[in-house]
């Protein structure tokens, strides 16, 4: 069965760069693209002064929208895609572009919603595009990919996982989408959480004997956690090898918390030269993509990387 991506497009340069980046990665696989254009009134050119009929203005809207879609189709054809692998859809006079894109994803049986990461700097980087932010927030079923400006070939993925069931979902999504690609490399990273307060806050200073006992309790907690993560890593590895990823292209890392989960993950992104970061929308400590969540911090700060948000 063909894999279908829904790409929410607009007329920005970022969109077409993202389309070409992603399309180049999947050219030789059975991937189809559904180009979805949700046009809000604010994104349409002003009506010409000579236009007096509403029907004339609607035709102007349709032509402009079709030009954007045609440009996307042309880009894919030039890369080498057959027209049968491309479909298009337009939603004119959209009131909520994010919701229209999400609804389009549900109706098209897609493998992921794809958007362009609009690279910004300074304060603007902390305030993501409204449509993108809303899709991150409310895409509770479909995975969301935000394509960065780093080349995706060859794909080098850092999958940040914890002890929640998102590790299984991330592994499954990676297997379905990137598993068949010949040069993919995937690293699963776990940042061990801080010790629970009950292990260090007793309301009094521990004496020598109590400190010795506490060390044993903490070591047992760490051993149990490592055993749990070892099982999660093994299961994820099995899912990927079954999809065709060679064993030697899968690695796992576990480290103690240093600066905090998000900063530790970002530090590994910088060290490892990854071009894709895969995250769960809700980890064991996050309920949603809010400004202070781990996922939100990584989305804002992983410069140039493509972000996969698995729901």
Language-model features: locations:
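Short, flexible loop segments at boundaries between secondary-structure elements
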Residues: 142-152, 299-311
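Small/aliphatic-rich secondary-structure junction motif
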Residues: 1-55, 155-219, 242-245, 251
